[in-house]
């Protein structure tokens, strides 16, 4: 891994020089999920510290429409564009519009070169044989650039991105390197703990609105309160001590033996939101609610944004539990699917995935947007959701992402045809 890092550092050095030698303003475009917002936070802090004028925008997709708008900006202002958590899949459009650009992405690249032309540098782990779906996130890629400036403290936001993109169990490759570097500089402390201690709210609320793990029988405040009372734990405690932890673990495992992930490695970071899991959930909630500026503000440790983020998180968690209770899973040969609400289908799919991939979709105007989720067991059996969802092109849409998590967009009248085709492809993958 260190040999690969040395090769990557040749590119990060070139990116640093490109940023320092640009005297106009910088245009940052990043994604709206946790990893994208963490990436935006890293880049914002880095550019503020280097006294660079910049304008940051968060988008759901780097669509042709978004690129066309940026092209008009480019004609007038000639900024340096930095694309984070996107760009490698849209590089032909970026080249076509003659952008002066830096691409910091971890999705499979269309062009497997770092130096695309005299104007475009691409830092993508896949070019160096590093798996962007398991070994590093977009925020990790952004951190490798910030690290070139000596900003090692920004590793904490990369850790949040690792959690947001579900790359923490286990930590592999450059993810492990980033976490170890953060530990070395004392920006993170890792401790094994019960998952409910993350939230610092009354423990009955933590249990009622927890989705990892999701225990349907306890997914209401009243039921969680009674369960704790019955086993002799004060439901209003905000942190469980070792005695109460053992008591709760024993009770849950006895009653719900299939439940996993009750004990986790918590990442206590140097940030006003101390727990990286909590910060990751907060960014996901504000991102899914379209409060992108709040998300970046949380990364920048703005007190008002953190306060708003905490309120939005608990509203989101309550809505999520209600949505989970109402979801009606339908089954094809190789997938489960459901129709859900905007901003929730991805997280619901990831909660419900077990023996088959789960695909959620919602209708927005004339189009249907899909989020597909698998797990590592399915990927090890051959699942590649990025390939499966890319079949959207056959239906006049587009799709892609990672092997374990991916998305697609097609017209709403093609939903059933698309799902049937995806089911066939996934069946072929899992039979290999």
Swiss-Prot record:
One of its GO terms (molecular function) is nucleic acid binding. It comes from the Archaea. To M.jannaschii MJ0977. Coiled coil: none annotated. It comes from Methanocaldococcus jannaschii (strain ATCC 43067 / DSM 2661 / JAL-1 / JCM 10045 / NBRC 100440). It holds the Pfam family DHHA1. InterPro entries: DHH_sf, DHHA1_dom, SSDNA_exonuclease_RecJ. The lineage of its organism: Archaea, Methanobacteriati, Methanobacteriota, Methanomada group, Methanococci. This is Uncharacterized protein MJ0831. SUPFAM superfamilies: DHH phosphoesterases. One of its GO terms (biological process) is DNA recombination.
